């Protein structure tokens, strides 16, 4: 593959660098992200996914009808174990 040839991967990972000129105007320059920028992007996306999971979990939690103390305790323990397990594997 030629050095300058764009693949779907490189096209999809292009990002915009915004550089300020001396007079305050902004210019946009397309470029390929470095590893740090890709990691930042990945972490932002994963944060959004985690927030969505937490919201869905709370909605499910709030939808329970007349939960007993024991059933709540069981659910909390299961969720806690699951989140800890996922935290270590990610």
Swiss-Prot record:
Region (Disordered): 1-31
A single Gene Ontology CC term: membrane
Subcellular compartments: Host mitochondrion inner membrane; Host nucleus; Host cytoplasm, Host cytosol
Protein name (database record): Protein PB1-F2
Native source species: Influenza A virus (strain A/Turkey/Wisconsin/1/1966 H9N2)
Function summary: Plays an important role in promoting lung pathology in both primary viral infection and secondary bacterial infection. Promotes alteration of mitochondrial morphology, dissipation of mitochondrial membrane potential, and cell death. Alternatively, inhibits the production of interferon in the infected cell at the level of host mitochondrial antiviral signaling MAVS. Its level of expression differs greatly depending on which cell type is infected, in a manner that is independent of the levels of expression of other viral proteins. Monocytic cells are more affected than epithelial cells.
Misc remark: Is not encoded in all strains, and seems to be dispensable for replication.
Main location: host cell
A Gene Ontology BP annotation from the UniProt entry: symbiont-mediated perturbation of host apoptosis
Keywords of this entry: Apoptosis, Host cytoplasm, Host membrane, Host mitochondrion, Host mitochondrion inner membrane, Host nucleus, Host-virus interaction, Inhibition of host innate immune response by virus, Inhibition of host MAVS by virus, Inhibition of host RLR pathway by virus, Membrane, Modulation of host cell apoptosis by virus, Viral immunoevasion
Site (Low pathogenicity): 66
Family indicated by similarity: Belongs to the influenza viruses PB1-F2 family.
UniProt superkingdom: Viruses
Region (Mitochondrial targeting sequence): 65-87
Family annotation (InterPro entries): Flu_proapoptotic_PB1-F2
Keyword presence, Membrane: yes
Complex formation: Oligomer. Interacts with human SLC25A6/ANT3 and VDAC1. Interacts with host MAVS.
């Amino acid at each position: 593959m030629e050095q300058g040839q764009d693949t779907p991967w490189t096209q999809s990972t292009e990002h915009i660098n915004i550089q300020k000129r001396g007079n305050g105007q902004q210019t946009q320059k397309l470029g390929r992200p470095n590893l740090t920028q890709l990691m930042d992007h990945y972490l932002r996306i994963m944060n959004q996914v985690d927030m969505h999971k937490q919201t869905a979990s709370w909605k499910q939690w709030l939808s329970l009808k007349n939960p007993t103390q024991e059933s709540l305790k069981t659910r909390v323990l299961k969720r806690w174990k699951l989140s800890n397990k996922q935290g270590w594997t990610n």
